Amino acid sequence: MRGRSASDALSECTKMTDRPPHILFRDDTSGQVMLFADPTEIIVAHTRAEVFTGLARMEEARKSGKWLAGYIAYEAGHLFEDKLARFATENRTTPLLCFGIFDHPQPDDHPLAQPTQRLENEEFLTAPKATWDFATYQNRFDRLHHHLMQGDCYQANLTMPIEARWSGDPRAAFWSLIERQPVKYGALVDLGGPVILSRSPELFFRTDEEGWIETHPMKGTARRGSTPAEDEAIKQTMLADIKTQAENRMIVDLLRNDISRITEVGTLDVPKLFDIETYPTVHQMVSHVQAKLLPNLEIRDILAALFPCGSITGAPKISAMTILHELEDGPRDVYCGAIGMIAPSGAMRFSVAIRTLTLFDDGRAVFNVGGGIVIDSTAEAEYEECLLKARFAIGDQPIAGTGSV
């Protein structure tokens, strides 16, 4: 683990840019923002030992009255399972864990919390290209489908990267993406490494000061209609569709099982099942799971039970993660990890880092897209869904490298 002081962090950021280290969270549905700037320390972990040392340092800082904000990469979840741990550091250049330690959130009128506008019609991302054409996707899909037929897993969330070029100010891009697709869990993370822009609609988990935890698994996607009547018909079709319900219920059951490991017996509840949330390009099926946490848990305990979120792995979870490691070319990095904040009280909130871009200093941008595959899925429909989900970042730009579907 590398713990960097505030002056070191600022120096590292300004070597490459004029941006001070900061993290901005925004709920676009309410307009509420929460900004963290001027970190006293930045925790960066690249190995198993560094991750667990970093989590301990985070807990120590929280208990001393500090706030924490940052991200944990998808592959860090491998570290909580001995049989997967060796996969965590394969072929990666980005951190497994990156969190700032802060004295307090900044006021809403802080300059870094204010909108920064781009020029009209200026594209932030250009030259998007799928790293898997349809033939490649079909091959991975068929191999996954074989696992499903053999009963090795019941569902798995197969993902692929889209690469593009980026230019300009990431803050301006963050605000432009809000206009394209408002979400509840938007985040911009700029702590000196790759800049992370997340447009996640999905809550991973939230805990409160009284010890309650809730999670909102999201599974089931349909394209928006062109009229309100068509939208309503699509939503009713989703609610009646056995495949969509089965996908969502499998993840609900997985998360109920995960949460039960760290919560009091008799408190587990599913207050919402098969709810539909509507976004500019898609409808999503969402359910809610909640329970009362056992006393005296630390962030490591919660992550060991829940991370990564079952909605972006599959079921059974460990089997699905093992199969996906075999099928996907490289690390997901921040994508499908978690981005969030922790208060001194122990209350915390993390989103599932879907619809999330990683911006590298050389002008390269990477974001993954994917979906849950079950036994009656088809490669054509799933690949088209992947391309649809890419629209949050690139709008109507054509995606190169897809081949014929």
Task: Report each predicted region and the residues it spans.
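Extended alpha-helical targeting/anchoring segments
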Residues: 5-405
